[in-house]
Amino acid sequence: MRPVRSTPAHQTADFAELVCSNSLKSDSENTAPWLLKEEMRRAGSLLLEIARECAVPAGHALAVDRVAFAARVTEAITREGRITVRREEITSVDEAGEQVTIVATGPLTSESLAEEIARLSEPQERAEPERASRPLPHNSHSPHLYFYDSISPIVEADSIDMTRVYLAARYDKGSADYINCPMTKGEYSRFYDALLEAQSVEERDWEKLNYFEGCLPIEEIARRGRDTLRFGPMKPVGLMDPRTGKMPYAVVQLRQENLRADSYNLVGFQNHLKFGEQARVLRLIPGLENAQFFRYGQIHRNTYINAPTLLRETLQMKAHPYVLFAGQICGVEGYVESIATGLMAGMHAAAMASGLDPLPSPRASAFGSLVHYVTHADPRNFQPANITFDLLPALDKKVRDRKERHRLQCELALREFDAWMEKAGMPAVRA
């Protein structure tokens, strides 16, 4: 819709304007971001090709000159004779017809279109016309459309010191599924002081949020008083330490993140701290002194749908199969992930336009793992995700060495990806 109607973050009329970081993540071989980009390269991603042409020195990462990148993308699209560019705000989606539509409007989707997406997302018997006419507040969410995300850190299971923690469920109800990190009064005081001193991410004006009381950043809870955490996410009541027979002064609970039990979520630890500060503060928690993090906590403005409820593995809506979602609005996080899902949606849309059924990408690939997460995560607690090895399926054999395990996962992913491309009639681009 730019420049007819702009957003609070964009400055130009160019496509693909990068408003935050200029980094497209690690280019180190056998890392998860590298794997996703390698699959994109083999699928012939135009945006990745342009990013390489606009790259600036950034060590082992792919970073771009953001002005040159946006200009080159805009030029490539406007010069393509088969693409018609319409500079106008879209406020409705034709879900009833058979025209394939991809919704890829990003985290700053306009309010009018957000209302339309909320209407599409409602169960059919509840999607009444007058419902869509009510404005959706941007500090709230509808049942299937959210306006900011709150993400708790995820720690690698192998990096938890199990000699310092214990398994238990609160009041011994159900099975002992939580890892509990107990704190003494002194340990809690050190953690609390470090948390209050930690630096937060600086917000732009358009990113400022009005938090839900039920989903406050942990540092915001801490600012309300020295004991607020002990009566909130670090509440020890009902979590007796079997080693001492006593209730700890405070407890941090870790919840299993996947079926493989190789990663754990820090319950209630969504935060708005800088990543380096998170690592420093969270490693003060007993048992996490040497913690390795798959993901750090985040809270930021973000419009996205409850994809596990709404989307198929082909990124099509379950209720409206001619409508596909891609990019951050479908529940992925980051430039590379957004480009990748856009590429996938485009491939599926092309198949549909040719009268073919879209073929889901293989589960073992980075493409497939990213979409599998988006479409199979717990819809009651769905949060956007970056590509990490945590999303990829485990190997058939256990490999303790992390680097070797990741190398083998990448090898399997690319083999499966190439076979999928061949089956879909799009031979992979070789090096």
What are these model-predicted stretches?
Residues E203-L209, N290-Y296, L356-S361, A428-R430:
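Flexible, glycine/charged-enriched surface loops at secondary-structure junctions
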Residues H10, T31, L35, V64, ...:
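Conserved active-site and cofactor/substrate-binding residues in soluble primary-metabolism enzymes
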